[in-house]
């Protein structure tokens, strides 16, 4: 007879009439195993849910694919790339690409009467998909930003607003250093909160035109292009296809 089966039968059945009797120790062990499995399943579900939430927030701030200069991996102070209408159309026509949008960045500093905060001013145009920030907007509005005019409106995070004691409608003085120190006064029209501190403590959103002027760039130059995909699982193959497409559009500025 199989040894394991023999031991199991001895534990499971009593000597009196082969009645099924589950000793308390066995019952407790079974309950413990069931609880342990439940905790493991719950833990895995929480980890998967947290991972998905973090991924969605990263994508919300920067989309699935970013096309930019190679120095963008080291700094938000980047050299521009030229993005023509034909290039945008070609990227948008690529299978798997849901949406295409331009952006420009400029590192700077916010200064109030008694505090200061480093930040990155992100300029976006009218085509920017704002659904992510609208979902996380807690005060004010998320306006349609412009690529042809500077409205001096800005959307900031609650984390920065709380740290600098700012509120909706306040005007903030921002400073940027390149060849010289440049200043811009911006009006807070919206406050967002994603609870993703790595980004909430960093990004302000404003007109693409304003950031391009601070960078002294041509109207068709930007820090990069963000691409939203239909299917995250096809990210790798779409990235290779997009790389081939970008290679067909040389930068006229070198």
What are these regions (language model features)?
Residues 36-47:
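Alpha-helical transmembrane segments
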Residues 50-53, 87, 214, 238:
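Hydrophobic side chains in well-ordered alpha-helices
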Residues 51-84:
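Membrane-interface junction motifs in transport/secretion proteins
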């Amino acid at each position: 007879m199989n040894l394991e089966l023999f031991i199991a039968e001895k534990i499971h059945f009593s000597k009196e009439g082969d009645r099924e009797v589950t000793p308390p120790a066995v019952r407790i062990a079974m309950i413990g195993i069931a609880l342990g499995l439940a905790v493991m399943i719950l833990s895995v579900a929480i980890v998967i849910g947290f991972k998905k939430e973090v991924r969605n927030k990263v994508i919300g701030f920067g989309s699935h694919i970013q096309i930019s200069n190679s120095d963008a991996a080291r700094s938000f102070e980047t050299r521009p790339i030229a993005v023509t209408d034909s290039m945008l159309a070609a990227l948008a026509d690529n299978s798997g690409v849901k949406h295409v949008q331009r952006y420009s960045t400029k590192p700077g500093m916010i200064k109030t009467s008694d505090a200061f905060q480093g930040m990155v001013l992100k300029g976006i145009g009218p085509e920017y998909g704002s659904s992510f920030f609208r979902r996380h907007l807690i005060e004010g509005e998320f306006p349609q930003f412009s690529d042809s005019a500077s409205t001096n409106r800005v959307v900031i995070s609650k984390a920065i607003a709380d740290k600098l004691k700012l509120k909706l409608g306040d005007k903030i003085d921002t400073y940027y250093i390149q060849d010289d120190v440049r200043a811009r006064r911006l009006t807070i029209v919206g406050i967002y909160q994603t609870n993703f501190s790595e980004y909430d403590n960093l990004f302000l959103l404003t007109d693409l035109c304003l950031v391009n002027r601070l960078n002294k760039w041509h109207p068709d130059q930007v820090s990069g292009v963000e691409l939203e995909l239909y299917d995250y699982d096809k990210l790798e193959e779409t990235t290779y296809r997009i790389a081939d497409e970008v290679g067909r559009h040389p930068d006229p500025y070198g």
